[in-house]
Amino acid sequence: MCNLLNIEKDPIRVLITGAAGNIGYAIAPMIARGIMLGPDQPMILHLLDIEPASSSLEAVKMELQDSAFPLLKGVIATTNVVEACKDVNIVIMIGGFPRIAGMERKDVMSKNVVIYKAQASALERYASDDCKVLVVANPANTNALILKEFAPSIPEENITCLTRLDHNRALAQLADKLSVPVSSVKNVIVWGNHSSTQYPDTNHATVSTKTGDRPLKELVTDHNWLKNEFIVEVQQRGAAVLRARKQSSAFSAAGAACDHIRDWFLGTPKGTWVSMGVCSDGSYGIPPGLVYSFPVICEKGSWKIVQGLSIDEFSREKMDDSARELAEEKDLAYSCLNV
């Protein structure tokens, strides 16, 4: 008799752009091992990068094949954006133009606008109807906004950007401060832009103790640290890694992207929220149309902004500062498009 438990799921097609880079190299085996979609979900990986990186891209494909991952049912490595986007279900957009010393913000923005406009158009035409997108490449929030503009058939709730790395950094800093496992800390919030204006908010965070969950602020009594050093440490952590390593964060970013997609698809634990960059609906006074990081809960492939949280005056100011920066980025991006 057929054992229904042994029926294999259909493979999910996952596109990684910028797949030959450091983050792409880190995330591909994580996905293939089942870290992102679970231990029973097969996948076919689509790897996209630019022509000058084609040799490195082929090497990533070879290493994936050589690893003999049971869940990996195929690898497509290409520099052709149409081939890369064909029938994909999940897109992780790591490819972008990094800011180089001496470049003006508008120069960087204009280059990324061109990249994301082209890739959005390809996804619009060739991706699966239920395609879900995570933008990692900076400026992540505004790149996601451009994607939304030029892929109008993709529901806006299916276009997100990565602030989970900032969220994870905040959890780690708090756990270190309290000398507890990072898994004991939950429900921090990263509001706003994935930039130095992001606001890591601890007002609603809790810590698991032997007697149950307790408000973090009862345990971290140095509230001055929470309002100053902690915030700056999270905001500047990426720059600190860059200074120390001479390269930007790679496997921590890859791991955060896996966390983001896993929770989106498989759901957040009951009573726990995470931070995701999503299209604002006006919640918490954030202007609609911006891609802004909110606290969300996820279930069955959908996310929902956590509502009803109290916002103090300090938080309001920080949240609005980041919203203003995102509005400026939006205007700058649209000026590059002449929209």
UniProtKB/Swiss-Prot annotation:
It holds the Pfam family Ldh_1_N. The active site is at 194 (proton acceptor). Oxaloacetate binds at residues 105, 138, 169, 194, 249. Disulfide bonds: none annotated. It is found in: Cytoplasm. It catalyses: (S)-malate + NAD(+) = oxaloacetate + NADH + H(+). Catalyzes a reversible NAD-dependent dehydrogenase reaction involved in central metabolism and redox homeostasis between organelle compartments. Belongs to the LDH/MDH superfamily. MDH type 2 family. This is Malate dehydrogenase 3, cytoplasmic. It comes from Arabidopsis thaliana (Mouse-ear cress).
